[in-house]
């Protein structure tokens, strides 16, 4: 028996990286947020309370420079870019429970309280440093970042020499703890092979500069014990995962916050592979460890890959950055969600392809799912005025085979989805669609309708098709939520409140159930380019 009741567990706390507000969103941002939204919806579909946090990273040197270039204040600049992210998430159906904005005073209070606590614990100290600094990545560089020829790679952008005094966090004191933690907690990072990247990066670990002088960077959170400096943007940004989850809320006076003890640790920090090392896999767990968090209170990192275009990483220089707004306008928001989840294996890179996207839309969504729904409803309306007969008295091996496929899907779907194998979860649901389309071809309802002696068999065929589609509308609801709502409306069936995957049993549609009229779910599209130069 399928056991997917997760209500006995703590609330599922899932976060994404907060997006840097120096530029508008691209397809990589969209993938990450849709991935997290799909998992949040899946967990809710299994009876679990969920807190889904996403947001924007609004401080830092890149923002300050972008604002200066645009001739506006940093706050005005980030507000404008933030609105683009908010509007895109609404368009794509990304339904979050908490919004993290690092200019929020609630966040600032927690960051400053943490800094003060670390200072009081003698975890911070001030020293002078002379060396190289990456303007793009907003961090100091060491010889470890040099290539074989002694130069710094393109990923660092403009590199300048700096000599200045700053505050440092005693990161190196905790390196051996982190090494042991990673080795003894294989579930800390998914996929597990990414752990080797982290372990390799721990050798020769140095302390972390956590400040920038105000004379160079004014757009940031001031250090509570030395207001000549602002906090390093990565330290500030990482704290969002706990500041907006209610950490220190009572102590700093933050009201209307989640119950931190109830939802922490995070079940999933969904991030890109480019920010695993050093930020999320080194800085963040060590920051928590230094604050007194136990090993059992460490979050889990879910690391996804990159979307490339024709095998090449997206970049402004190459002009191949894809705008998700434009793509969603072409293939619909659900069409984009489906393609992103279908064509990427969580943790690995994928290639964005116009051709594959159109195949996914036209062949699978329109031709597979949409056409099945249209045929099932049209035949039911034509032959039975949309009324279903659950107890026709007819059964055969063809019916039984379809019922077996429908019955097997929930457990396999749950296993794949719960393991972050979203594309395989989709495939398990799609087995019903494929089988149901074959079922139509085998049973040929239009022929049965011509023979009154086959009336009971026709009733059973029409019921089996509608019932199978009701199951599909549940399983695919985390992936294509808007389309599934439309499916259920056309089927004349609404999921009861609290309905779970484990409630999927044959007989969702009662005897005498009235189906609605068919409306194209995914109208076919002409081949179009989705690249936005």
Annotated model-derived regions:
Residues 2-11, 25, 51, 55, ...:
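Basic, alpha-helical terminal appendages of large translation-related enzymes
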Residues 2, 7-21, 38-210, 247, ...:
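Conserved, charged catalytic cores of large soluble enzymes
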Residues 366, 370, 403, 407, ...:
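Generic structural concept
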Residues 2, 7-47, 51-54, 106-110, ...:
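Structured secondary-structure scaffolds
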Residues 349-354, 407-415:
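Short, charged/polar, low-complexity loop and linker segments
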Residues 139-143, 268, 307-312, 363, ...:
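Short, mixed-charge aromatic SLiMs
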Residues 63, 82-85, 284, 324, ...:
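Generic structural marker for isolated residues within well-ordered, non-membrane alpha-helices
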């Amino acid at each position: 028996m399928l056991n997917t009741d997760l209500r006995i567990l703590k609330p599922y706390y899932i976060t994404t990286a907060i997006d840097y507000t120096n530029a508008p969103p691209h397809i990589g941002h969209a993938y990450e947020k849709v991935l997290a939204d799909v998992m949040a919806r899946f967990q809710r579909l299994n009876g679990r309370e969920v807190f889904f946090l996403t947001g924007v990273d609004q401080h830092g040197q890149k923002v300050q420079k972008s604002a200066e270039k645009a001739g506006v204040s940093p706050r005005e600049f980030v507000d404008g870019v933030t609105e683009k992210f908010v509007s895109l998430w609404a368009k794509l159906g990304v339904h979050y429970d908490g919004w993290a904005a690092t200019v929020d005073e609630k966040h600032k209070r927690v960051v400053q309280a943490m800094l003060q606590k670390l200072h009081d614990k003698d975890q911070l100290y001030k020293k002078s440093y002379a060396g190289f600094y990456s303007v793009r990545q907003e961090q100091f560089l060491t010889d470890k970042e040099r290539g074989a020829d002694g130069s710094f790679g393109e990923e660092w952008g403009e590199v300048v020499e700096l000599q200045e005094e700053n505050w440092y966090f005693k990161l190196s004191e905790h390196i051996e703890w982190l090494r042991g933690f990673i080795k003894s907690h294989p579930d800390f990072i998914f996929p597990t092979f990414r752990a080797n990247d982290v372990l390799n990066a721990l050798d020769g670990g140095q302390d972390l500069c956590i400040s920038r002088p105000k004379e160079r960077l004014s757009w940031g959170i001031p250090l509570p014990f030395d207001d000549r400096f602002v906090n390093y943007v990565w330290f500030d940004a990482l704290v969002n995962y706990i500041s907006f989850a209610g950490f220190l809320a009572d102590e700093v006076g933050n009201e209307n916050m989640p119950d931190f003890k109830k939802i922490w640790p995070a079940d999933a920090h969904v991030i890109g592979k480019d920010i695993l090392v050093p930020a999320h896999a080194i800085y963040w767990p060590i920051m928590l460890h230094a604050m007194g968090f136990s090993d059992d209170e460490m979050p889990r990192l879910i690391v996804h890959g990159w979307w490339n275009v024709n095998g090449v990483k997206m970049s402004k220089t190459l002009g191949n950055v894809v705008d998700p707004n434009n793509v969603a306008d072409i293939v619909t928001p659900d069409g984009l969600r489906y393609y992103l989840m279908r064509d990427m294996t969580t943790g690995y890179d994928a290639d964005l392809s116009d051709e594959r996207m159109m195949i996914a839309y036209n062949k699978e969504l329109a031709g597979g799912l949409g056409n099945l729904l249209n045929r099932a409803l049209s035949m039911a309306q034509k032959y039975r005025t949309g009324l279903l007969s659950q107890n026709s008295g007819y059964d055969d091996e063809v019916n039984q085979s379809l019922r077996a496929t429908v019955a097997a899907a929930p457990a396999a779907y749950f296993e794949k989805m719960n393991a972050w194998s979203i594309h395989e979860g989709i495939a398990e649901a799609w087995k019903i669609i494929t089988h149901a389309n074959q079922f139509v071809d085998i049973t040929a309802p239009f022929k049965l309708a011509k023979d009154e002696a086959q009336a009971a068999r026709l009733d059973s065929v029409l019921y089996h098709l509608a019932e199978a589609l009701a199951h599909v509308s549940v399983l695919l609801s985390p992936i294509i939520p808007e389309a599934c709502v439309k499916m259920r409306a056309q089927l004349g069936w609404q999921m009861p409140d609290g309905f779970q995957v484990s409630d999927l049993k044959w007989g969702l549609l009662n005897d005498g159930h009235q189906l609605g009229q068919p409306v194209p779910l995914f109208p076919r599209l002409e081949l179009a380019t989705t690249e936005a130069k």
